[in-house]
């Protein structure tokens, strides 16, 4: 059994070395609006200097998974794929306009709140999240894009004013 574990461990080490860093330029994001959408989820609209829907295809000739907007609600700035932000908002990024040089996107956000004991509060528990937002001027967000064989790509930070976010939350 230990020989099998050694082989598996060696294979993991080999595969870990297989991931490449994508040659995608850093994308600057600019918030254009933040409002409650038709599905009653809070929706961020923003522009990007990189076409987030086709970044890996444009720069690496590789397919990618759907981009995700991730916002840290508890001042946790570790956006790496090896780490999960316990109190966050995230949503799939969809294209609204792909006119160059600024592509426009939106993301309907779902709010997650994992307590210190590991249990999850109800999704979109705004009453638990509102006090965290009130203590901050802005909420940092990044778009993450993944593709097979590549390290996750992250955009530059988008700051959403916390007042704007709390103002759109249902009471």
Region annotations inferred by a language model:
Residues 1-7:
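Bacterial N-terminal signal peptides that target proteins for export
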Residues 15-17:
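C-terminal motif of bacterial Sec signal peptides marking the signal peptidase cleavage site
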Residues 9-12:
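Hydrophobic helical h-region of N-terminal Sec-dependent signal peptides
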Residues 19-171:
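Non-catalytic macromolecular-recognition regions in eukaryotic signaling proteins
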């Amino acid at each position: 059994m230990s020989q099998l574990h050694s082989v598996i461990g060696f294979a993991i080490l080999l595969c870990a070395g297989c991931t490449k860093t994508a040659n995608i330029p850093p994308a600057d994001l600019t918030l254009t609006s933040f409002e409650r959408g038709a599905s009653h989820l809070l929706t961020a609209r923003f522009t990007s200097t990189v076409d987030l829907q086709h970044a890996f295809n444009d720069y690496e000739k590789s397919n990618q998974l759907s981009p995700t907007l991730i916002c840290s609600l508890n001042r946790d700035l570790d956006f790496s794929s090896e780490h999960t932000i316990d109190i966050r908002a995230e949503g799939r990024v969809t294209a609204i306009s792909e006119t160059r040089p600024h592509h426009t996107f939106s993301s309907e956000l779902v709010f997650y709140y994992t307590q210190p004991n590991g249990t999850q509060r109800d999704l979109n528990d705004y009453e638990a999240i509102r006090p965290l937002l009130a203590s901050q001027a802005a909420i940092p967000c990044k778009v993450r894009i993944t593709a097979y064989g590549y390290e996750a790509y992250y955009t530059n930070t988008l700051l959403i004013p916390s007042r704007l976010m709390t103002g759109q939350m249902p009471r």
